[in-house]
Amino acid sequence: MPPPPGRSAGGPRAGPESGEPLAGPAPLVGVELVRAARRGDAAAMDALVRELMPYVGRVCGAIALDRGDDAMQETFVAVLRNLHGLREPAAVHGWVRRIAVREAIRVARAARTEVLDPGALDRGAAPAVDLDAVVDVRSALAGLSPEHRAVLVLREVDGLSEAEVAGLLGVAEGTVKSRLHRARAAFARRWAR
Amino acid sequence: MNAPGARWPVAALGPIARARALAAAVPGAASAEGVLDAPYDVAWPWVADLEHSVPRFDAQVRALRVLERRPHGDAEELRIRATSFGVSLPFTVRLENGFCLMQARRRLYLVVMAAEPVEEGARTRFFHMEAVPLPGTRPLRRHLRRAVAADLRNLTRLASSGF
């Protein structure tokens, strides 16, 4: 490790006991953590990643499936690189959600192999099945396009309203309703096989 | 679909992906990545013994002394002093299984190391990053690139000879 700028060899050297004590203010959380990360504090950036990891893992896993880990890395690269553009630190979770969904869809589309055409799926009434009973959803999700998985995840896992999902994805509310209907139908059809 | 038993696929961010994300965001960061010819269960504990490992693979660190260590959840927090080019600099360290972040006081210097088992643990993927994340330090980047590349070469050699 080279010396930091402005420090010359042979300069003043503090004694080994003069470092910063570990005991200090309470751990940073929430807004303060975001502010510290924005200032370039790498420990705070890493703490922010750890705090957001479970949520981002759920979004990226459900949308990007087997490429979920890649999507997660891309999400955190984008989050950390663009923290300075986050105007309101308190809105960090919504901001990260938007990035995670975008990156997960992008990564999934790039890796896409066999995906069913939702338009070809049953356009009938929404299935009257108890989807809460679903245990293993991966195979069902795999039959949907990344965009449909995003709608499903945001609505069913995140609990966002259709209007919120539409705003986040930048599509009309009617498109969300349509995608949701098709996704649920496809989900139920695949599950029933 | 939100039943407690439902298993939605969940993605994971491994130590190396986490370190790569930091490296991509920290200004002026230089990084190197490679595979060590040593089992993870041997390589990481050796690296994590910072007092002994860092001065051996980082030619620019003459000494590293751990002043304090305490558990912090699944990690350890350390307070250390590293001496390089005659300058002794205090660092705060977060040390986990496979991940180590060392940040100098006033963020003058940053070191991140990460490792993961590959080939069923028979070998170890290792990631090393250093940065002087301060304005106006871009000219240092070429030097940092050479330094982290040399560190990785040293570590690779040490791993191949059984440390």
Model-based region annotation:
Chain B
Residues 1-71:
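Hydrophobic ligand-binding cavity/cleft-lining segments
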Residues 36-38, 84-86, 117, 132-134:
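Beta-strand elements of well-folded, non-transmembrane domains
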Residues 37-41, 71-72, 94-96, 115-125:
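A short, structured loop/turn motif at beta-sheet edges
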Residues 43-54, 80, 93, 126, ...:
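Hydrophobic pocket/interface hotspot
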Residues 71-80, 94-103:
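Short, hydrophobic/aromatic-rich segments at coil-to-beta transitions
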